[in-house]
Amino acid sequence: MYNYNYSRGNKSMGNPPRFHELTDMPDNGASTSAAAGMFTRQDSLALAASLQQRDRERNPVDFMETQLDLDNYLQCFTDLDVPADNVDLNDAELQKANILYDDDSYEQPQLNPYERHVAYGPGFRNPGEYEEQDGYKMNFEVKTEEEKKPETMKTSKTMTTRRAIKRPSCYDDYQEEGETSLSDNDESVDDSYYKPKSSKKTAAAVPNFVPKTKARKYNLKPDKEKVEPIYKLKRARNNDAVRKSRNKAKELQLQKDEEYDEMKKRITQLEAELQSEREGRERDQQLIKQLIREKESTSKGPRKSSRNALESFNKSNY
């Protein structure tokens, strides 16, 4: 056990208490003292833990009034180039020290153009970008078609080559709900951004379809035969026949459409005539009923002249 008694020094003599008097240890560091040689790295960690525990238990008022030499504390931590084999993980301070040793330096994540657009917006510019004013000089030279051809070829080549953009490592841990982890062997990196959420319906096996019709036989012609003029003549005649058949089919379709429109107009006209005929029949039936009633009334009462009957008939018609 260490002699850890507090003793205030003689302030008038200017002799403050020394740390080695409190701990019975040498002044030149407990962990790497060449003279003593009794402490190793593991012992220095244990010593630091014991000193920290005693600092927690001591009276804070006495602790503030006494003078301590912090070189021993600093020496214990500066000599720890490699973490100890057996670390006391129950101690909170040692856990913090171990985390600091193992933690890598912070590196700013590299964003691709899409993530930069989402994070900073379309108007964001990196510092030092667009500083050269020469880039804004306008070029009024009109290029001919021959000069434009190599540029179009370059752009077409650049569009065909597709570069796989890797997702930054800082976004690998984040996954949305229902999203499955993807491997590079199954599909490309770009396809993983736009893959829809997996569903249980896709897991079901697709039934096999058996075609009921037979496909016509088609054999590809060799390149030598395609170069011959006879083959070109056959292809020209065939194309001409195909165009004629297509034009004829279009004409027949137009003729059918015209006949269909005429039939629709004729049907509407006949329906209107039929409706007018029905209305005329209804009027005739009502008139006949009215005449019968008048005849019955005249037979019971005084007779009316035939002239009055005809006048009433004409009025009802008009």
From Swiss-Prot:
A GO term, aspect molecular function: DNA-binding transcription factor activity, RNA polymerase II-specific
GO terms, biological process: defense response to Gram-negative bacterium; DNA-templated transcription; regulation of transcription by RNA polymerase II
Biased composition (Acidic residues): 173-190
Coiled-coil ranges from the UniProt annotation: 242-280
Region (Leucine-zipper) residue spans: 267-274
Function noted in UniProt: Transcription factor that binds to the promoter and the enhancer regions of target genes. Involved in responding to mitochondrial damage. Has a protective role in response to infection by the Gram-negative bacterium P.aeruginosa.
Superkingdom of the source species: Eukaryota
Listed Pfam families: bZIP_2
Swiss-Prot/TrEMBL keywords: Coiled coil, DNA-binding, Nucleus, Transcription, Transcription regulation
Residue ranges of domain bZIP in the record: 228-291
Region called Basic motif, residue ranges: 232-266
Main location: nucleus
Record's protein name: Transcription factor zip-4
Disruption phenotype: RNAi-mediated knockdown decreases survival upon infection with P.aeruginosa.
Comp. bias intervals (Polar residues): 1-13, 307-318
Localization: Nucleus
Database matches in Gene3D superfamilies: 1.20.5.170
